[in-house]
Amino acid sequence: MDALIMAGGKGTRMGGVEKPLIKLCGRCLIDYVVSPLLKSKVNNIFIATSPNTPKTKEYINSAYKDYKNIVVIDTSGKGYIEDLNECIGYFSEPFLVVSSDLINLKSKIINSIVDYFYCIKAKTPDVEALAVMIPKEKYPNPSIDFNGLVPAGINVVSPKHGYQKEEIMVIDELIFNINTKDDLKLAEMLLKKDGL
C-alpha cells in the first residue's frame, strides 16, 4: 500500500504559517509523519504540497532527496478534499491518507491499519475505505467528536471519486493532531513526558 501525506493547507488556525515546517522539539511536524511511514510496510510516500506550502516542497525535496520512494505532488491548494481529489490519479489501489501535522504516529500503528484494512477487505470485498478513530477519553482536547470517537488523521481510501463504503477502526494509541498554537504547546508537553 502507498501513502499520501496531505501537506498543502493554508495553516489558517496557526496564523498562516506552513504547518508542516513548524518545529516541535527540534523537528519539523512533517518529519513526525514521514519517519514512521519510512519504517512501515508502506511502499511509496506521496506528499501533496500546494502554492500555500512552497517551503514545505523545498524542504521535502532537500531533506528526503535520497529516498526514491518519496514523491511530491503539486496540487492547487484549494482545500483538503479538492487536493485529495487531484491526487487520486496517482494511485491504482487503496492508499493511506495521512495529515502532515500528526505526532506520536508509529510504524507499528501504520502496519496495523494496513493489515486491518486488508483483513476487512478480504471478508467484505465491497469495503473501499477505512476511517481510523481514537476514543474521545484518550484525546486531550478534541475539536471533533463522532459519538465518542475522534478522527485520528489517518485513513485508507480507494482511488475513485464520490461515495466509498467505509469501515471504522478504533485504536487505543493517541495520535495527536496539531491544529492550533495551544495544540502545539500540549504536544510539546506530551512528547517531553514520553521522552520523545
Curated annotation (Swiss-Prot):
Pathways per UniProt: Cofactor biosynthesis; adenosylcobalamin biosynthesis
Q: EC number(s) of the enzyme?
A: 2.7.7.62
Disulphides? none
- Listed InterPro entries: AdoCbi-P_Guanylyltransferase (IPR053669), CHP00454 (IPR005245), MobA-like_NTP_Trfase (IPR025877), Nucleotide-diphossugar_trans (IPR029044)
Bilayer-crossing residues are: none
Which GO MF terms are attached to this record? Answer: cobinamide phosphate guanylyltransferase activity; GTP binding; nucleotidyltransferase activity
GO BP terms: namely: cobalamin biosynthetic process
Looking up SUPFAM superfamilies in the UniProt record yields:
Nucleotide-diphospho-sugar transferases (SSF53448)
Q: Which reaction does it catalyse?
A: adenosylcob(III)inamide phosphate + GTP + H(+) = adenosylcob(III)inamide-GDP + diphosphate
Task: Enumerate the UniProt keywords alphabetically.
Answer: Cobalamin biosynthesis, GTP-binding, Nucleotide-binding, Nucleotidyltransferase, Transferase
Going by the record, the broad EC class of this enzyme is transferase
State whether it acts alone or in a complex, and with which partners, per the record. Homodimer.
Which PANTHER family does its entry note?
ADENOSYLCOBINAMIDE-PHOSPHATE GUANYLYLTRANSFERASE, MOLYBDENUM COFACTOR GUANYLYLTRANSFERASE
Q: What other facts are recorded? A: Binds GTP first, before binding AdoCbi-P.
* Task of the protein: Guanylyltransferase that catalyzes the synthesis of adenosylcobinamide-GDP (AdoCbi-GDP) from adenosylcobinamide-phosphate (AdoCbi-P) and GTP. Is involved in adenosylcobalamin biosynthesis. Binds one GTP per dimer. Cannot use other NTPs or GDP. Does not display AdoCbi kinase activity. Is also able to catalyze the condensation of 2-phospho-L-lactate (LP) with GTP in vitro to form PPi and (2S)-lactyl-2-diphospho-5'-guanosine (LPPG), but is much less efficient than CofC, the presumed enzyme catalyzing this reaction in vivo.
Protein name (record): Adenosylcobinamide-phosphate guanylyltransferase
